[in-house]
Amino acid sequence: MLPPRKLAAVHASYYVVTGAWAIVDRRSFEAVTGPKRDYWLVRLVGALAVAVGASLGSAVAAGERRRDDTTLALATTLAFVAADVHAARSASRVYLGDVVVHAFFVPAWLRPWK
């Protein structure tokens, strides 16, 4: 497994890339995740993911993790996992893969950065 700080960098990047993807390329995003009725909401969630990723990336770049950074990372992870589980029931099972990815990131915010 990656050292916690590097894993946190991957986590931040994951939010930026997947959030931007939802905003920039609707066709490929829906090809993977399934069609969406209210795409403005997808863009909003994408923008929030980019913002969270940028904030977490800032902590990684500074090499300093504050309690607020950990809270933001874990609360956002929990929110995405809850949404993914719900979406997997009614939409695409691909969302369960996202749950696994998020579980992989949790140790980055619970273990000390060295």
Where are these regions (language model features)?
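Short amphipathic, positively biased membrane-proximal segments
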Residues: M1-K114
